Amino acid sequence: SLDTTVWNYHGPHSGNVFFTGTEMAVDSQGKFSSMDMILEGRNYLPITERSGFAFRLASGKSVGPDPTIFVMGGNKAFRGMPFLGVYGNNYILGSADLRVPLFDFIGAQTSGPSKHALWPFMQFIDIQSGVYIDGGNAWYNKGQTPYGGNNTFVPDYSAGYFLNVPTAFGLTLRFSRGVYGQKGSTFWIGYNW
């Protein structure tokens, strides 16, 4: 892997990431079960100190008698799609984001004893928003469709907007809503982008 990214408070802001990997699995009897190959590249292109573009292209393939099923869908992998709603032994995913600051600070205050206990959860600093387009899909190898789905690549996409709200203890609330193509909404609590 190669990583030249420079990070800011919200995550990667400039640079590139390239990752490739191969994994092989055996079953309980020591016989070959599957081999997975993945390839991913990301590019972060700053516009200003706090805004910029993020691009991602990822693909994967699993072969063998019991191949891995890759799963996508939800806030971090194929926004606008149902959570874990895209699956198969092969996948291609591309995404492009425009990330911009929305609010430097927004908060609320309570009175009484709860004021100090709730303070970390009522202050939000450096809220970001933006627009995205995600495209791709997953499909099964020929003759291997255990859960239904496609055994050929059928492209799909979602374009919409997102909101990232950093909270106490380094966690981020992430909301996204597809407006064109797949129109799902997602909510996620986690860290980073």
What are these regions (language model features)?
Residues 115-118, 156-162:
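Short glycine-rich, acidic/polar surface loops and turns
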Residues 119-153:
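C-terminal hydrophobic structural anchor segments
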